[in-house]
Amino acid sequence: MPQLNPNPWFSIMLLTWFTFSLLIQPKLLSFTLTNNPANKITTTKPTPWTWPWT
């Protein structure tokens, strides 16, 4: 059964992951973010609805 033979597919998978992790990933991580992430801790309490019949 050829689909169970891992010889070509395993090497292709390893080559793909090494290419991604060594060449593409550092180039993607070198970009600067346009908006700096900020902590959003502000919590607002909802205003209760005033029912006209109570």
Swiss-Prot record:
- A single GO cellular-component term on record: proton-transporting ATP synthase complex
Identify one Pfam family in the record: ATP-synt_8
Q: Which domain of life is it from?
A: Eukaryota
Q: Which GO terms describe its biological process?
A: proton motive force-driven ATP synthesis
Identify the keywords attached in UniProt to this record, alphabetized.
ATP synthesis, CF(0), Hydrogen ion transport, Ion transport, Membrane, Mitochondrion, Transmembrane, Transmembrane helix, Transport
Indicate where this protein resides in the cell.
Answer: Mitochondrion membrane
Membrane disposition: Single-pass membrane protein
* Residues of the signal peptide: none
Tell me, in one coarse class, where this protein mainly resides: mitochondrion
Its Gene Ontology molecular function terms? proton transmembrane transporter activity
Role this protein plays: Subunit 8, of the mitochondrial membrane ATP synthase complex (F(1)F(0) ATP synthase or Complex V) that produces ATP from ADP in the presence of a proton gradient across the membrane which is generated by electron transport complexes of the respiratory chain. ATP synthase complex consist of a soluble F(1) head domain - the catalytic core - and a membrane F(1) domain - the membrane proton channel. These two domains are linked by a central stalk rotating inside the F(1) region and a stationary peripheral stalk.
Q: Which family does it belong to?
A: Belongs to the ATPase protein 8 family.
Mind telling me what this protein is named? ATP synthase F(0) complex subunit 8
Task: Name the source organism.
Answer: Gallus gallus
Provide the taxonomic classification.
Answer: Eukaryota, Metazoa, Chordata, Craniata, Vertebrata
